[in-house]
Each structure stands twice: as structure tokens, then as C-alpha cells.
Amino acid sequence: FLKYFNPISNRRSSIIDTGMIHNKIYVGTSGWNYDHWRGVFYPEKYPRSKWLEFYSGEFKTVEVNATFYRSMKPETFDNWRKRTPETFSWSVKASRFITHVKRLKDASEPMQKFMKPLTMLGEKLGVILFQLPPSLVFDEDVLENFCRCLPENKRCTFEARHSSWLQENALLSFKRHNIAWCISDTAGRYPFREAVTSDFIYIRLHGSRKLYASEYTEEELKTWAEKIRRWNRDTFVYFDNDFMG
């Protein structure tokens, strides 16, 4: 994917030349601990206990989805931090208790609880992803109140799955708080808009034709690279089409 930015780019690189300034481009996957990746991405006999080290030798970032389903101990994040290179970046999905149970309301205490163990990642914490339920309709007051609960100086992105979030008021709220609108390719299932609302870009590629299970063609990857070049910001790109590794 990075080869489309300049001739000397490779998968291990996280810096590209946009032609104007140097921006960081982080490319990774949504998770790394998949059984069906053995023999496809990971060598057949490579020990599972070393998969993270192998992964972080190939990619500069990963998106953690397990935190959406359950809380994790600080020791887990500390372990991950120690096992990855200094330049590695972790993006972490927020708890579904915040997004799907509380639905962004009265979220101050849950946010503090969620963030506390994440501090163990230190400077390797990249972006906090809030994946909203398809039934959650945009409410400006709810969003503004929730934004007051967000940690200072931490990058956040919202993946909205209801069409009401496409309206300008929602995007203006994101801009006010420097929150990235998650540009999410979901094979047409959920709202799609290439909106730039912060000083960084966050892209989730779930599959262009079949959700979670379709590969991206060379032409599609080239098109995405051209868009990223044009947006000219730090960018996080995660592939969530993990069916065949």
C-alpha cells in the first residue's frame, strides 16, 4: 500500500513525502491474533507467543478491538508496549458500555475507567476509536456533553453508523473538538463520507464489495493512496477484511 506514496516506501516505513511536508502514515490491521493467519501471514511453525513481535516487525500500528467487548488490565497494555518498537502506534476501540449501553450519555466515569489502563501504553497510544451503534441518532447536545469527557491531548475518532451523522452540524462539532470523522468503507452497509474534520485522518477498510471478506484491488489501493496524499495529514489506515489474512 505504501509503495503508492513514493518509490522508496515499503511496509516498514511510517513516513511518506506528500510533496509538501512529511506526514506520518500508519498502516495496519484490526487485530493481529487470528488463528487463520497461521501459514498465511505468520509462518506455519512460528510460536503464537511471538506473533505480536512478528506483526510489529511488518507494520507500524494495530487497531485493538478486544477492548470494545471487555476491560483489560494495565499489565496487558504495559506488556504490549514493551514488546513493540518505539515507533509503534496502538489505536484502541472504546468500550461498548460507553457507546452502546450509555450511548454517549453520562459517560464521564466510564471514560475515566476506560482510559486508566490505557496510560500504560504511554506515547504509543495513537487514536481512540468510538464505534457507534447503527441505531444511535445524532444529537448535538449529547455529542457536545460527551466531548467534555474526552481525554485532553488524545486523538479520537468516531465511526458513525446512522445516516443522521452525515449532517453538517455533526461534522462541525467534530471540527470544534479536533475529532476525526472515521472514513469507513463498509461495502455500502453504513454511511460513507470522505469528511476531514481534524488534523489527522482515520480510515477503516472493512471491504469494498463484501464486508470483512473482500480484498482490495491494486487500483483501489492506488486510489486510496491518492486521496491520502491530497488530504495531506497524519493518517491511520486499518484493514478489517481479515477473512483470508
Question: How would you name each of these model-derived features?
Answer:
Residues 1, 5-18:
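Short, basic, low-complexity termini and linkers enriched in Ser/Thr/Gly/Pro
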Residues 17-245:
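Residues lining hydrophobic/aromatic ligand-binding pockets adjacent to catalytic sites
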